[in-house]
């Protein structure tokens, strides 16, 4: 495997990556990289599986898609069949990262781990299910300099966040600044 550099970043795996919707690739002992395919310009998400003594730690989850749930089902009955999911960590609130967190936590009766701001903001955005944009939001973006074209796009997309994610669990385990968590324990 050859290290590759791009704009000062070093990619130790070079151009190697897991196949979309394929088998996990081990990048360190007990650390597995899985790629889930998604529709759109960003056509995939990288998901990490950390093998711990009490089960799997899942880092990020994919959008709420039937194809993603099917890929998870394949992992549950194949690669991950020896241990349950013990915890789900979401790195941030984007739907491709939190989309199936609630589904996984409910299925495996495990905790969601997130920072407070990401959990609370994600929960707030998931609550916007109406197609009607609040006037305060329109005023905010207009004052922020949105053009008429951007305002139209914002109005058309408003409320779609919740369609891309399952509801988050009602409780979570807060990740705090500088916290570390050893894996493979």
Regions from the PLM with identified roles:
Residues 7-8, 58, 85-87:
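A short, structure-level motif marking secondary-structure boundaries and short turns
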Residues 13, 17-24:
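Short acidic, Pro/Gly- and aromatic-enriched capping/linker segments at domain boundaries
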Residues 67, 73-181:
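Active-site HxH/HxHxD metal-binding segment of metal-dependent hydrolases
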């Amino acid at each position: 495997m050859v290290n590759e550099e791009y704009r000062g970043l070093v990619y130790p795996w070079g151009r190697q990556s897991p196949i979309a919707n394929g088998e996990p690739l081990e990048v360190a002992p007990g650390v597995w990289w899985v790629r889930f395919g998604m529709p759109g310009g960003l056509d995939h998400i990288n998901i990490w599986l950390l093998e711990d003594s009490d089960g799997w730690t899942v880092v990020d989850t994919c959008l709420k898609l039937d194809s993603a749930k099917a890929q998870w089902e394949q992992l549950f009955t194949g690669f991950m069949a020896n241990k349950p999911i013990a915890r789900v960590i979401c790195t941030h609130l984007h739907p491709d990262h939190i989309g199936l967190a609630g589904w996984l936590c409910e299925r495996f009766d495990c905790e969601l781990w997130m920072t407070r701001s990401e959990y609370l903001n994600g929960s707030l955005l998931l609550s916007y299910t109406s197609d009607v944009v609040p006037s305060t939001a329109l005023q905010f973006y207009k004052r922020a300099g949105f053009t008429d074209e951007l305002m139209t796009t914002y109005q058309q997309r408003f409320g779609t966040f919740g369609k891309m994610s399952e509801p988050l669990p009602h409780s979570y385990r807060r990740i705090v600044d500088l916290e570390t968590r050893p894996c493979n324990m």
